[in-house]
Amino acid sequence: KHMETPMSADPRNDLYKLYARFLQKYQPKMFVFENVMGIKSANGGATWLKVQEALRSVGYEIECHEQNSKNFGVLQNRRRMIIVGWLKNSGLSYPQFEQTIADATVNDILSDLPALQPGGKSGEYRSDDFSDYLRSTGIRKDSDILTHHCARPNKDRDIEIYRRTIELWNDGHKRLNYNDLPDELKTHKNRKSFLDRFKVVEGDEAYCHTMLAHISKDGHYFIHPDIERSEERR
């Protein structure tokens, strides 16, 4: 049976030491260090203190602030801790970022993607007519080839849950609670936590919830907001 590596034993926890060695060798005037919000509380806060100490020890002043990608024109609610460092006595400081909310919705970034059958994939966009947001951000270009557009295999039971999840959101911006499903659609034994395990992407909003690295475990968390596409997947 596959056993996951405990977070405390993950070798990536010490990558900041390698980062500090690069800083010490190349001595850039400034650097940016990004990490997830959880770094502040990892190991009771000890890891966060060690990271800051390592960066300061190689000759840098540092400052850290929480930043959110949605405040920089990105259609995703993604909070991160951003450390900016500069050489001591350089007179530099943490930048004052101009924040901009995108004049677009998440649907604008999904509009040119073709519908897929369960387990299917496509390497072609559905149309050459794409949104101004895709054009202005450079996400979509005339010569672009569509990549990584594939759908997970879905059971009929999951598709029915998707339909209910989408209707709840589109009709009243409400989230589906797993315990509100009829018994014939419930397969998970855990009925006390992760009750929002089925979640639709907020297509009509200026940003959606955070995309996760472990999407294989949370694949029901990013349901396409178009109800017609949900029906097509049958």
Which functions belong to the PLM regions below?
Residues 1, 39-42, 73-76, 91-93, ...:
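Short catalytic/ligand-binding loop motif for oxyanion handling, primarily in non-cytosolic enzymes
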Residues 11-86:
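Conserved Class I SAM-dependent methyltransferase catalytic core
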Residues 17, 45-49, 104, 108, ...:
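A structural signal for well-ordered alpha-helical segments within the folded catalytic domains
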Residues 2-10, 227-228:
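Short glycine-enriched, charge-decorated loop/helix-capping segments at active-site entrances
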Residues 73-128:
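Flexible, glycine-/basic-rich loop-and-beta segments that form/coincide
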Residues 135-234:
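C-terminal target-recognition/interaction regions appended to catalytic cores
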Residues 67, 110, 211-212:
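Bulky hydrophobic/aromatic "packing anchor" residues in well-ordered structure
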Residues 5, 79-80, 206-209:
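Short, surface-exposed beta-edge/turn micro-motifs
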